[in-house]
A protein has these predicted regions:
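Structural signature of alpha-solenoid helical repeat junctions
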Residues: 3, 37, 75, 108, ...
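Canonical tetratricopeptide repeat
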Residues: 10, 44-47, 78, 82, ...
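Residue-level recognition of tetratricopeptide repeat
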Residues: 13, 47, 85, 118, ...
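Structural signature of tandem alpha-helical TPR/SEL1-like repeats
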Residues: 18-26, 52-61, 90-102, 122-135, ...
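Structural marker of alpha-solenoid helical repeat scaffolds
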Residues: 34, 68-72, 105-106, 139, ...
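TPR alpha-solenoid repeat register
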Residues: 41, 75, 79, 112-113, ...
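TPR/TPR-like (Sel1-like) alpha-helical repeat modules
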Residues: 67, 170-176, 187-213
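Short coil/turn linking the two alpha-helices of tandem helical-hairpin repeats
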Residues: 73, 124, 156-159, 193, ...
Length: 236
């Protein structure tokens, strides 16, 4: 056990919890170099590495967690879920889904529904995505991510924008800062000619903390804002 590493790791976790991500990364990096070895601290580090796209380093941290003795079933599940996300990002979506669906047989919760629901969309099978995301909403019909997933399913896979919007509207009512929901709703605003509202939504989305589980990227949002600024002669 590394007293110093874990002490710094606790500071990193506290910063992480306050959404001070840049500070958290710096502290996690230092803590890891000093031997941080508490599962919950390493988990926090791995999550932040995944969210910031440092997948090889995240995989290294996950392997360190896996080697620790006495992991609880919940910690093992969390490990497998994060490993699956890395696999997906490295181009192995089907293998990632196998791992997630195996875990899902033993644990059904909002997090699992939201992750698998989104990856079902990424797989591109509209019927499978609709069926799973319908089940997710039967589990919790107020979950913002599951509502957004259903909206994306209709928008991206089915091509039914009218039905999609009903889910995006419900999702934004649950989480007004949601990156993807704001992005998609901005597209409706643009079609309706409400440029002001579209820009407001895009700026809200741009201010979020992105992860691999977001459809919209900072680059996509910046491009859309630039397009609106050029088209309507605005300074954005």
């Amino acid at each position: 056990m590394s007293f110093m590493g874990n002490m710094i790791g606790n500071k990193a976790l506290a910063a992480h919890g306050k959404n001070e991500y840049e500070k958290a990364v710096q502290l996690y990096d230092e803590a890891y170099e000093k031997g941080m070895d508490k599962p919950r601290l390493l988990r926090g580090y791995s999550v932040l590495l995944i969210r910031t796209g440092h997948f090889d380093k995240a995989l290294e941290v996950l392997k360190k967690i896996e080697a620790l003795p006495g992991l609880t079933p919940a910690e093992k599940t969390d490990l497998h879920v994060n490993y699956a996300i890395i696999l997906w990002q490295k181009g192995h979506l089907d293998r990632a889904m196998e791992i997630l669906e195996d875990e899902f047989r033993h644990l059904k919760n909002g997090t699992m529904y939201s992750i698998i629901g989104y990856l079902k969309i990424e797989q591109g099978d509209a019927d499978a995505a609709l069926a799973f995301n319908k089940e997710a909403l039967e589990y919790d019909d107020t979950d913002a991510v599951s509502l957004d997933n259903m909206g994306q399913t209709y928008y991206r896979l089915v091509g039914d924008k009218e039905t999609a919007k009903t889910y995006f509207d419900r999702a934004i009512a649950q989480k007004s800062t949601a990156i993807d929901t704001n992005y998609f709703l901005s597209l409706y605003d643009i079609e309706a000619g409400d440029t002001e509202k579209a820009i407001e939504r895009l700026k809200t989305a741009r201010g979020g903390f992105f992860s691999p589980l977001n459809y919209a990227t900072p680059e996509m949002i910046d491009a859309k804002l630039a397009e609106l600024g050029t088209k309507y002669g605005r300074y954005i």
